[in-house]
Structures are given as structure tokens and as C-alpha cells.
Amino acid sequence: MRTYSCLQLVIWTCIFHMVDNSTLQGKDSSHFLRRIVNLKKDEGKMLHRAKRGWMWNQFFLLEEYTGTDTQYVGKLHTDQDKGDGNLKYILTGDGAGNLFVIDENTGDIHAAKRLDREEKSLYILRAKAIDRKTGRQVEPESEFIIKIHDINDNEPKFTKDLYTASVPEMSGVGTSVIQVTATDADDANYGNSAKVVYSILQGQPYFSVDPESGIIKTALPDMSRENKEQYQVVIQAKDMGGQMGGLSGTTTVNITLTDVNNNPPRFPQSTYQFNSLESAPLGTHLGRIKANDPDMGENAELEYSIAEGEGSDMFDVITDKDTQEGIITVKQNLDFEKKMLYTLRVDASNTHPDPRFLHLGPFKDSAMVKISVEDVDEPPVFSKLSYLMEVDEDVKEGSIIGQVTAYDPDAMNNIIKYSVDRHTDMDRVFSIHSENGSIFTLKPLDRESSPWHNITITATEINNPKQSSQIPVFIRILDINDHAPEFATYYETFVCENAKSGQLIQTISVMDKDDPPRGHKFFFEPVPEFPLNPNFTIVDNKDNTAGIVTRKDGYSRNKMNTYLLPVLIFDNDYPIQSSTGTLTIRVCACDNLGNMQSCNAEALMLAAGLSTGALIAILLCVVILLTLIVLFAALKRQRKKEPLIISKDDVRDNIVTYNDEGGGEEDTQAFDIGTLRNPEAREDSKLRRDVMPETIFQIRRTVPLWENIDVQDFIHRRLKENDSDPSAPPYDSLATYAYEGNDSVANSLSSLESLTADCNQDYDYLSDWGPRFKKLAEMYGGNDSD
């Protein structure tokens, strides 16, 4: 309370000083207001000062009041107040009524709640003095401020609860690592409540912190990551300038030492031992070596190499980037018989050295690698990787064309035998001497059919047939002039009837299957048997071609329509080869430009006296004749259909049988006499007699006319088929006829009616029914004696 009273005294002293410097103007003292502030209400002592109008600017109040009573702020008063209770004081503005309350009679202001400067540090309010009787303001409304003074009630807080930082290892003292920051919500302009000081609680003696800036620095030189990589530092921030009683906050900083290349690689052992078969292929991995480097990442990347000296040309080392190992591989073919042991020096060095630490020594290490070569039974080795041989195509069978040589590289030097791989010489053109490797021919050679022969020779150890090797042999067949030149193509040559002497009618060229090294050279001459041809001559163009030239004016197709011209062709190689080719020259009719129009075919027709119109007429007659022959043949195949009634007396094709007891009037069946004459025509259409037949449309076909048909035999055969038909009803079945059809146009001919009628009936009326019933009238008509 002593501090609080002193603070109020200082504030009001400043206010009174301001009042003393003011000049009072005006004569009416009734317009002066008096503001009375009670500095200490309990003491009962009051300081007052008179001034015209309202004379306050601001009040001050400490935050976080913890008393039980309301906190007194100040008093409002005007000289118009006579103390008789006629004036009423009203307070409006920020917090009026809930935070700040006023005694409307006395003008005393109190804080009803505890205030927090960090929430709101300034309140603006307005004061009024009103006459209770008239309700009018005795003074104009005035504005004043209540400022909240700060107390140290907030501790410093860091922006992060946990910081993460890194610093390179081997850093010097004072190397900056990271800066931490703490803030205090108290008023930095009032006292030391917001003045923060940093200190280190954990992490010494490795790190330190600047008390004002919060920058963490290294405190020890040359800290090694390999010894310790992670550090945890605790930093404290305290207000009140770090004095006793100040509030504080802490944070944690995790610091990692990052790697630098300050360690050279080191082999864990000085000597390595590996073995290799002498037959190991190139690139075979013999073993791995590794140098250790405690650094990390690219600082630990290594490069292996073989130092110049023994074995550097026989072996190689490859760096495995994933495992940082050196892989020893075979670089050249090994030979146990030549060298059995190799000693190599392998170096391992850093690929990214740090110049700052080169003074520590060379960043590489060396180790010795010994490689022992083991003996194996090796296959024969040829003296060459491949052989090329040449031979003339006219050599005799059995001629030697070359030799291959192979040897056993082993110390035992086994005997070698040679053979030809027949898969490469299917025609068995060549063979080889099994002991000395001489290759010779088995068949005649022909360069034109096979200019090259590629065979494979196999060399095999006699004592160990599994040990063998092969080599390709390329045999080129050299050309011999053994083919005569001949025409390059077939020439269709003609000469116009109106040709002039000396006219070129054909240029010929030739071909030769041989291939002389100096190229072809051909010559053309007439054959010796006909050195001088009166019709044509051969002109050698000296460029491997020749021209056929006429020797007279005009040619006649009627006299000679074809000429044969033999040509002698020979080359200039050794031995000289020649051949004779014959040109067939036709005589043709040509236009003025020399284009062929017609040749000897028209000449023959004209000689026979046939014109073009006659030829067309002959062809037309031939076509008509062929058409007539085809029509006649077609008509012959048509067979004449036999008429249903041969004569008017033949009425057999409608004879009706009445001995079928199931028959009625219109359901009786009559035999078709045409069918009886051609029974096979109905074989495929069998109708059941116990059902009503359906209407069947059959294709009408022509049947051959058979004059001699055994109708009786046909009827018996058909009867037998019906008797054996399983679908026909049994003979003793009862047939019921509910409808027997319409009346016949004739009187009833039923057998039932005939039995019941008088035996003496007159059948003469049958003669009136026409020729179809003539036979029936003859059978039943006439006298009884008949």
C-alpha cells in the first residue's frame, strides 16, 4: 500500500503543477469547477484545486486488484454542486455501469471488477452533471481516460516449446547455432516487467547463450560427431532483468552435430587373399574388400584403385556405390602355366575430401591383395581367332587348301585331333586331316553357285574328349573363266519392210557368270560358217554391246517373213570362252515412224486369199453352228411325256374298284394308269389309307416312256407293302363312317346296294354315260347268257 500511495502522490503532483501554470480568465467564478481527488480515503485528508469547468484528463488504476472492497478510482465534482443533493452525476463510456460505477450524489468512481492490462489498458469515459429538478446539464459533457498501470503478472514465453538445430562438427568456439526468442506480455514501457534475460540451464560446457539476444553458440572447440552426435540444451528466459523475484520460462533445444570429412578411410587388415581358376571368364568377381570410414554420407564415399605394378593389367577393382566395397575382377585371361601368384596393391581414397582437414594427413589407405591362380584342364587353343583361305574353283578333288593349328595349353600337352563340324558343311564339300589340320576338298567347286564356304573346325583332346574348342574357317572360291558369255535376255527383233540399208534395228548385250578381277570385255562377230550375211551385219560397239544393222533396202514378208542371224560372242579372259547366239528377226509392216503394225500373221492370211471380212464371217458361222449343236443336245435330253389316254377306247385310267367294304361314294380310290406304267415315280409318296390325304404339290417331272410294264407285278408289290405297313389299321378293326360324302351324279354303284337290289336290273343306261363307261356297259348290259 505504501508503493501505491506514493505512486498516486507523484501523479497528482504533476496534475497540480499543470493547474498552477494555467491562467484563469473571466469574471464569473460560478463557471469554475472544482475537482477533488481523494488520495487516501482512510486518512480523510483531501487536496483540492479550483479551476473553471471540468479539470480532469485521466485517472490511473493498477491492474489485478486483489482487495475485498471495490477499488477506488477518483472523484468527480463541480463548483455548481452546493452539497444540497440537487445535482446528479452520470458516467458513460467504456465499462460504465459494469466495470466502473459512480456515486450519483458524490461523484465517487469505483472499479467493480479486477482489471487486466494485458486485456485492455485504456478506458475512455464521459461525465455529466445534471440538475435533478430541471433535468438540465449544469456543465457540458466532458471526456476523461482511465489508464491501467501494469504489474509483473506474466512470465516470459518462448515462441516454440522445442527447437531443433544443427552445427558442423569441429566448429570453433562461438559458432552460432540458433537463436531462441521469448516474449513477455507485460508493459515494456513501464518498469522491468517485460525485460527478459536468457541463461542456459543444461548443455554446458558445450554451448552458451547470449543473455540479451538468445543466440546459442558453441562453447568448446573441435567437438567430434563420432564421439557424440546429439546434445540437449535447456534455455531459461527471466523478466525483471533477471533479478530475484522475476518470472521465468524455459525451452529445450536439440542440437545435432553434422558430419564433415575429417576422417580418412582405413582398411581393417593389411593383406587379403583370393583364388581364381585360370579359366575364369573376363569380369569374374574374385572377392570384396572394404575400408572403414567413420564419416557419413558423401564424406564416407570411397574410390578403389589398383596401383601401378604387378597384376594391374590382369585384374581390376570396381567400387560398389551401395556398400562402399571394392570388387576384385578378372581383366585379362589367366594362365596357370605362365604365372601362379599375383600381388596387388589396392588403394581406397575419399572422393570428397575437405581442404580444411588435409593437414590431418592423406585421406586414403592401402592394402595388399594376393591372388592365387589355380590350374584347370583347358580346351585346345587355336593359333588364330579365325582363318581365311582362298582356292581356285577348278582345283581337283582332294587338293589341300589350307591348314589350322591348335595346341593344348596345359602342361601335359595332350595330343589334338581335328574334325569338321558337319552342321556347317552339310554337302560334305571339305574335310580335314585329323592329325595335322590340313583342309582339303571332297567335291568339285563352283564359284558361281557358292562363292563362299563358311565351315567350323573342332579341335579335341584325345585323352579328354570333353575338352574341345571350335574356330570358324572362311573359304573364298576364286573365279576361273569357265563360263561362256550369252545373251542377257531374249530379244524379239523385227525389221520394217520399208527399212533402209545401214539402219540399226537392235542393240544386244550379253552376260557372263564369271567375275574376272579386271572386269568383263566381250566381242561380237559373225559365225565363221556365215562370214558375210547379205541381209544384216553385226557391228561391235566396243562397250560390251553390239548393233544389228540392215544391209539392203526393203524387205518383203511374202518372200521371207523371218530371218535367223547367228552371232559369235567371246570374252578376253583366260581361257577364252565363246558361245553362239541366234537372233530371230521378223519382217513386219511399219508406219512412217518405224512403229510395228503387223508381222507375218497377216501375211499368211492374205496369201490364202482371205480378207478380214471373210474371216469374221467364218467365225460367226462357227459360233452359230456351236449354238445349234448345244440346243439339239438339250432337246435330246427332254423326254416326251406319254399322254394319259392313248386312244379313245382306253378307259383304264379311271377304273374304280368296289370290292373294298370300307368304301363309300366319293371316297373310293381309283388307280392311276399313268402311275401303273411308271411305278417308281410314286415310290417316294406313300399315303395311308386310313387317313384323309393332304393336298400335296409335287414338282412335275418328265418320266421315261416304258411300253412294257408288268402291271400285275406292280400291284402285287404294292399290296405287299400295304400289308406290311405297321401304321395301317388291322383288318378286323371297326370303321365308323359318320359322313360318307355327297351323292354321286350317277346312281349308286355301291356293292351294298347291288346285293339288296333285284338281280334282274337293266344296265343299258351305262351306255349313255360316255366312252369311259363303255366297258362297264358291255360287262353288265346285254342278255343274261352273257
UniProtKB/Swiss-Prot annotation:
InterPro entries per record: Cadherin, Cadherin-like_dom, Cadherin-like_sf, Cadherin_CS, Cadherin_Y-type_LIR, Catenin-bd_sf
Glycosylation sites per record: 21, 254, 454, 535
PROSITE patterns per the UniProt record, alphabetical: CADHERIN_1 (PS00232), CADHERIN_2 (PS50268)
Subcellular location: Cell membrane
GO molecular function, one term: calcium ion binding
Domain notes: Three calcium ions are usually bound at the interface of each cadherin domain and rigidify the connections, imparting a strong curvature to the full-length ectodomain.
The protein, known as: Cadherin-9
Native organism: Mus musculus
Source species taxonomy: Eukaryota, Metazoa, Chordata, Craniata, Vertebrata
